[in-house]
Amino acid sequence: LIYLTSDFSPLTSKKMEILNSKIFGENLTNTPLLVFHGLFGMLDNWGSFGKDLGEYLPVHLIDLRNHGRSFHSDTMSHDDLADDIARYMDHYGIQKAHVLGHSLGGKAVMQFAIKYPERVDKLIVVDISPKAYPPHHQGIIKALETVDFDTVNSRNEVEAVLNQYIPERSTVQFLTKNLYWDDNKKLGWRFNLKTLSEKYTEFVSNAIKFGVFDGETLFIAGAKSNYILPQDEFGIKQQFPKAKVVTVKNAGHWVQAENPIDFANVVKEFLGLN
């Protein structure tokens, strides 16, 4: 089932949009797991994981704002992302959940856990830490902005443009999963490139606001990735004192895609599903 809807939120007095999601195992009654993708991603990236974990507990794969089939907005702060999660849970009557986020999604769930600690059972953060990161997506953003949808008429033509700027074929393939045909039979990006470009520094380069989440927390690092370094553990423990850091072998930043079996097993063990 896929949901795209609006609701009145207790967080505000005005009508607010609810994040788009796909739910696995929704007939199960144990604590649900909410899963959030990274920058330029969407819930479809997590389909196999959702189907697997959905045998054990309800799994909500969720599109962040300005991504996938979720609503577009001109704001994109960590607080915005955290409030979106709270509003989503209110809409579905979820008082408390396990939350998992990869990369940008990891920043969203960290901010959520600090802002709404009573609503988090267990926190899982995938290949990102609470620290500030230097900007490192400028080349990708420039490539995406170079695509002129008034002149390109096929996925192959879009790939040809991106290939001029992005050497990694896997990155180009990942980005082009976001292509869709609009009502005017014109190609476009599902993500809101304008806001993601304008607010990039705010949501990628900024550290998570200081605060403490004292619940059970797991940080999962890719062995081939440099997003979580040994020296980051001190800063992680300052905000997440019960955090454990586990490294998944044979995986870079895209841990769940590059070593899905070991990744899923680490998550299952942490959630007590094995």
Identify the function of each model-found stretch.
Residues 1-34, 54-57, 94-95, 201, ...:
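Alpha/beta-hydrolase fold catalytic core
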Residues 22-24, 48-54, 60-104, 265-268:
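Active-site loop/oxyanion-hole signature of alpha/beta-hydrolase fold enzymes
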Residues 38-41, 103:
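Active-site glycine-rich loops that stabilize anionic/oxyanionic intermediates
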Residues 40-48:
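Serine-hydrolase catalytic-loop signature spanning alpha/beta hydrolases and amidase-signature enzymes
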Residues 111-114, 121-153:
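Flexible "cap/lid" loop of the alpha/beta hydrolase fold
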Residues 184-239, 244-247:
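Conserved serine/cysteine hydrolase catalytic core
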Residues 243-274:
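Catalytic active-site module of serine/aspartate enzymes centered on a nucleophile-bearing elbow/loop
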